[in-house]
Amino acid sequence: SNVVTGVMSFAEMDAMMYKIEGEDLYLIGTSEHSMIGKFIDTVLPSDTLPRTLTSYSPCFRKEKGAHGIEERGVYRIHQFEKQEMIVVCEPEDSKMWFDKLWQNTVDLFRSMDIPVRTLECCSGDLADLKVKSIDVEAWSPRQKKYFEVGSCSNLGDAQARRLKIRVTGEKGKYFAHTLNNTVVAPPRMLIAFLENNLNEDGSVRIPEVLRPYMGGKEVLTPVK
């Protein structure tokens, strides 16, 4: 629990986390928790920054308060897998890393011919520890609207203060900045991929970037 309470606010914990009864343990809602927790109570030499990590892991979420048509199917589920990225960096570099991280997600989706846009969260929509957050949204031809497929956040030194992640260098000792980004969550990516590459006859066009991994196939044809 010392990691969980350090990486997120109480409101987020209540809405997301599954606690194991009788244990001081939680199921992770994102591998950000495990990766940031790696640096708990550490002093990092400034010349070893940035620290960049990525992880593909199972994720578990209660999704309290979720409702509506999007909650059916694979859009919002209690167990899924996700590729996450985190950065621990110098305070003056966090803005640069923030822009670089969300751009990774945008580039990935656009490489698969999925239209995406970014939406900067207003201050009232930010979780307590976040300095800035951007949602990456993909176009849904079925719903005729964009829906969230990823999120990138700059936590400033908020997580670092809670978890005692410090930097030492010529400027003395100070708190690092931390950031996280959802590269891809396969369930939502699959929705966006199928809807934007589906042909009228039920076949699915394979984007060029994926063809080398599909034996050179250009189209997936349904079995009748």
For each predicted feature, which ranges?
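TRNA-recognition modules of translation machinery and tRNA-sensing kinases, especially anticodon-binding
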Residues: S1-K224
